[in-house]
Regions:
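Short, well-formed alpha-helical segments that are part of the catalytic scaffolds
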Residues: 15-29
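Acidic donor-binding segment of Leloir-type glycosyltransferases
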Residues: 26-66
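Glycine-rich, basic loop-to-helix element that forms the pyrophosphate-binding segment
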Residues: 67-84
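Short aromatic/hydrophobic "clamp" motif used to bind/position activated sugar donors
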Residues: 89
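Acidic donor-binding/catalytic loop of UDP-sugar-dependent glycosyltransferases
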Residues: 96-109, 360-365
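Conserved donor NDP-sugar-binding/catalytic core segment of glycosyltransferases
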Residues: 102-147
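Short, flexible, basic/aromatic active-site loop/helix in glycosyltransferases
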Residues: 139-172
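Acidic donor-binding loop at a coil-to-helix junction in glycosyltransferase catalytic cores
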Residues: 200-208
Length: 397
């Protein structure tokens, strides 16, 4: 380490106007410029980028690492992060404009005593790029954006980031990389780099956050550390396609009920639903929850969705084995079945166990829809208790 407290890492390609304001905000931090470095991981070589960075060279400890490889956000983040020399790695976006006090507060309140934690700051204004495509934007001067941020921070709707307005039940699901930090030593020891198999926009940061959480690092929300999301052009259809593909990749890599719920309901809504979802699983299963049994039937891949499992994820009995070929290896995957990590028609037989009918309607219907999507043939077992319908109790989506 070089004595630098923070390494601020920014992934970049072709977003010059946003980056210029982001750098201006960093140059105006109350933390001394000698205490932090800014590393731009740029997936391009361009005169324009160098020209935009040059005016900040006497105001910031600024490093630009360039690559001509194809742009992917995880790759650009890793490019910057592998050049970091500070005690703490801070990930922001090229469209994140930090409040002047952000870095000093972040270090003093989260890392000054060597804490091994992951701090998530507020990034407000994500709604300025929702609702469809954005072909062009007009960015205002830094001072105007700062005034808008100050007004929000002093208003009655604060905290304004939607993640900070629901219960934080699934820690990794709020690990958006608009403003997030963790010790560089943890990055190195636990290999907490971004998975470069994730392509395009969406879910690469959540999968990274999942691994941060799995490493035993607490993820903590810090409403007092915040920034503004700057508007930028946006292709909503393209983002939706890559987000869906990345969600599937995430679930295939980490097939777990929390991942499954966030893939179905989204990160904010999934956090809100998690306690009632777990309670609904316990009621319907008569155990800790459900698993999906995977094996072969008549030589083809088969699923049995809705196997009651205990708290360790083991089936409460061996009844599920009778649905598969004799002697077949049967694996229990810790999923309910509301989202399944299979391509359409990949499974020969999808069987839905009877207790799935006892789930709240939204979850039951999601299971049935997924079974139909991934299976060439579907069998739904009748439930004599629920009579084919959902039992009362529990929240829907």
């Amino acid at each position: 380490m070089t004595g630098v407290k923070l390494s601020v890492c920014i992934p970049y390609k072709a977003r010059l106007d946003n980056l210029t304001i982001a750098l201006e905000a960093l140059a105006r931090q109350t933390m001394g410029a000698e205490d932090f470095e800014v590393i731009v991981g740029a997936m391009e070589y361009s005169v324009e980028l160098i020209g935009a960075c040059a005016p900040f060279c006497d105001r910031l400890n600024l490093v630009t690492v360039c690559s001509s490889r194809e742009f992917h956000i995880p790759r650009a983040r890793n490019l910057a992060m592998r050049s970091a020399t500070g005690e703490v790695v801070v990930q922001i976006d090229a469209d994140t404009m930090l409040a002047p006090e952000a870095l000093q507060r972040l270090y003093d309140r989260c890392f000054a005593f060597g804490q091994r934690g992951c701090a998530v700051g507020q990034v407000v204004g994500y709604d300025n790029n929702t609702g469809g495509d954005i072909d062009s934007v007009e960015l205002r001067p830094y001072e105007e954006h700062l005034a808008a941020l100050r007004e929000m921070a002093s208003g009655p709707g604060w905290p304004a980031d939607p993640r900070f307005r629901v219960e934080h039940n699934i820690p990794w699901a709020f690990a958006w990389t608009g403003l997030i930090a963790l010790p560089a030593a943890a990055v190195a020891s636990d290999r907490l780099y971004f998975d470069e198999n994730f392509r395009g926009w969406g879910n690469d940061d959540l999968e990274w956050g999942y691994r941060v959480c799995a490493s035993g690092i607490p993820i903590v929300l810090r409403p007092d550390v915040y920034g503004l999301h700057l508007p930028h052009p946006r292709n909503a259809a393209a983002n939706s396609l890559t987000a869906t593909a990345n969600a599937d990749r995430f679930l295939r890599k980490w097939p777990r009920r929390d991942v499954e719920l966030v893939c179905l309901a989204g990160d904010t809504r999934g956090n809100d639903l998690w306690p009632s979802y777990r309670a609904a699983l316990a009621r319907a299963s008569g155990a800790a929850g459900f698993g999906v049994a995977v094996g072969t039937a008549d030589g083809g891949t088969a699923l049995l969705i809705g196997v009651p499992v205990d708290g360790a994820g083991h089936p409460v009995d061996g009844e599920h084995l009778s649905y598969f070929d004799a002697g077949a290896r049967v694996e229990i995957v810790p999923l309910t079945g509301i989202v399944l990590p299979y391509e359409p028609g990949e499974v020969a037989l999808g069987r839905v166990g009877p207790r799935i009918a006892r789930l709240p309607a939204a979850y039951r219907d999601a299971v049935l829809a997924e079974a139909a999507r991934v299976s060439r043939r579907v069998v739904v077992e009748d439930d004599v208790v629920a009579g084919g319908g959902a039992v009362a109790g529990g929240d829907g989506l």
